């Protein structure tokens, strides 16, 4: 299965067309174009996922990059997505979407402190928030949900084309002691339990 929307084909078609034309002209660049198109399709893959037990699940594939208690006492966990990770994001806990807000910004590397000013989409419920953050190469954030929509844990939330980071602010009932992942741990969206 592929990520929702036309983006996979929008990004894969140009290198595929150039690659096929170059191959027809016996140019070795054709292989590069076809390989790039295949990579784009692979990058936008969307495998089925099921949560591994009760609790909050991580919203993104990748590496846990930050676990921090905010000034308001809420816990924020960030997951950095590398190029090899699935980039479809998942719902951490069931809830009704209150708002989906696009915030324009820069495109700094997602692992840097400068990413605090990057483009992002903030998805909020009464209990939790997920922030999808663009990075240096990730220029498109595609939310799948709208305000008023009821979501189940592990549902598809959106995707970021070509990378970056997803942060989740846990429900107020959870504190730092409830978090069962560690910084540097590899996690899978919609499967790995983040907090119990």
Swiss-Prot record:
InterPro entries hit by this protein: PS_Dcarbxylase, PSD-A
Gene: asd
Entry membrane topology: Peripheral membrane protein
GO cellular component: plasma membrane
GO biological process terms held by the UniProt record: phospholipid biosynthetic process
Function according to Swiss-Prot or TrEMBL: Catalyzes the formation of archaetidylethanolamine (PtdEtn) from archaetidylserine (PtdSer).
Signal sequence residues: none
Protein name stated in the entry: Putative archaetidylserine decarboxylase proenzyme
GO MF term list: phosphatidylserine decarboxylase activity
Organism this protein belongs to: Halobacterium salinarum (strain ATCC 700922 / JCM 11081 / NRC-1) (Halobacterium halobium)
Chief localization: membrane
EC number of this enzyme: 4.1.1.-
Catalytic reaction(s) noted: archaetidylserine + H(+) = archaetidylethanolamine + CO2
